[in-house]
A protein has these predicted regions:
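Basic, low-complexity intrinsically disordered segments
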Residues: 1-113
Length: 113
């Protein structure tokens, strides 16, 4: 069965990184997909911290940020103080804390990849 795509598959695939042996997505990339500011996404996570154990979400080290910023085009990532990444389970949990139809739709598409 073919699904209509809200977001091009290539856009999602380009936003997936392998860090610490886990496939993860950056907070800023997810915020862009959900059409919210990164700050808003991180505030929602902060209010629901118990839903995001370390195997769902973790902060990158300075070295990890430097490594990723070399592959991200036109990135100001290396100037960010904190960068959070989300595993597949963390991405699934985000729709429950963002509580929007867009978040649910985006998560379904991310899970299908």
């Amino acid at each position: 069965m073919k699904h209509s795509s809200l977001i091009p598959v290539e856009r999602i695939e380009k936003a997936i990184y392998l860090i610490r042996g886990e496939k993860v997505m950056l907070d800023r990339d997810l915020a862009a997909l959900y059409e919210v500011e990164t700050r808003v996404l991180n505030q929602a996570v902060g209010r629901n911290r118990e839903r995001f154990p370390p195997d769902f979400m973790f902060e990158l080290t300075r070295e990890e940020i430097t490594g990723i910023s070399q592959t991200v085009t036109s990135s100001n990532l290396k100037f960010s103080k904190r960068v959070s990444v989300f595993t597949e389970q963390g991405v699934a949990m985000l729709s429950s804390v963002l509580r929007s139809k867009r978040a649910i739709s985006v998560n379904i598409e991310v899970m299908r990849i």
